[in-house]
């Protein structure tokens, strides 16, 4: 018990209480903003192996509960993740999963193929699963996603008749908007069977069969198809590629992008390279890795991509 308290004393951003069955401890100075209630002690060895997994799984089992302001509790611990203990060698299978085609398809399927109805419960009508773009303070999530796609399409400088590839096309809203507004010919690729089926349904529903196609395909198979596109876009998919495959991903883009073409890459980024959080990798995004901007720019140079524009949408993602 005391060892656990000593471990938790490293997290000092907010004052909080730690409660056990027969005892209570005050950590930090000032009035506590929340209480961590341990109904069952967590072995110190588990906290040292992975603080994230130990606390997260204890909460899932009901061995740990948060009383008071849950947002502040999450902000408190997640904002100090640099103080978490992570034994990367002991968590190798979680932290550094295989980036083979077979394994990445399995990881994508485990996240996206749990049913479109589930995603419809909390995504907006566009089924966009990435950062919105808020032009006005009172923009709804739907309007922010429409804004985002419109903004992306403008950055791509599309013209009627152009060909556009969307790598990781999701449920297809971006390509549908591009076809309707610019009369481009678009191709979307995804590894998710659920997204593939829904996108196909939407294409038929919108009468866009002459403009759009969607394929179940790994980006690594693109060069084999000998496709060539005027424009390539990828929104929120790079996080699934894996650090070992960033260069390969960009190589594949370079091979299918026509000379003088434009490539727009939208991704969640970190300031520095980091293997990621064990709990998130195990339960939310298997195989997911957040790249840094600097490493992606470095890889882009190897394929002679000239960076024309960089924009940070962090505040928009926070609101999304």
Regions inferred by a protein language model and the residue ranges of each:
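Conserved class I S-adenosyl-L-methionine
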Residues: 160-168
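A short glycine-rich, Lys/Arg-flanked "PGG" loop and its adjoining helix->strand segment in the class I
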Residues: 247-259
């Amino acid at each position: 018990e005391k060892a656990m308290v000593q471990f938790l004393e490293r997290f000092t951003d907010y004052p909080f209480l730690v409660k056990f069955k027969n005892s209570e401890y005050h950590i930090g100075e000032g009035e506590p903003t929340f209480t961590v209630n341990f109904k069952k002690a967590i072995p110190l060895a588990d906290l040292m192996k992975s603080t994230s997994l130990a606390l997260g799984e204890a909460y899932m089992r009901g061995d740990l509960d948060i009383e008071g302001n849950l947002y502040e509790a999450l902000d408190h611990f997640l904002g100090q993740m640099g103080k978490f203990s992570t034994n990367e060698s002991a968590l190798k299978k979680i932290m550094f999963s295989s980036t083979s085609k077979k394994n990445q398809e399995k990881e994508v399927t485990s996240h996206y193929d749990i049913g479109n109805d589930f995603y419809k419960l909390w995504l907006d009508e566009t089924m966009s699963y990435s950062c919105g773009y808020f032009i006005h303070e009172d923009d709804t999530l739907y309007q922010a996603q429409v804004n985002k796609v419109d903004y992306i399409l403008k950055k791509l400088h599309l013209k009627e008749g152009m060909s556009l590839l969307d790598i990781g096309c999701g449920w297809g809203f971006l390509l549908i908007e591009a076809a309707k507004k610019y009369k481009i010919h678009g191709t979307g690729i995804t590894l998710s069977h659920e997204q593939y089926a829904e996108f196909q349904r939407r294409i038929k529903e919108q009468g866009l069969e002459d403009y759009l196609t969607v394929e179940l395909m790994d980006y690594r198979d693109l060069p084999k198809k000998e496709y060539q596109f005027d424009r390539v876009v990828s929104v929120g998919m790079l996080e699934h590629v894996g650090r070992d495959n960033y260069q390969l991903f960009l190589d594949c883009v370079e091979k299918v992008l026509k000379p003088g073409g434009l490539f727009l890459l939208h991704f969640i980024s970190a300031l520095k390279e980091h293997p990621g959080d064990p709990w998130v990798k195990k339960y939310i995004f298997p195989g997911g890795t957040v790249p840094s901007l600097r490493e992606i720019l470095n890889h882009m140079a190897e394929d002679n991509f000239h960076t024309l524009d960089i924009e940070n949408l962090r505040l928009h993602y926070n609101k999304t």
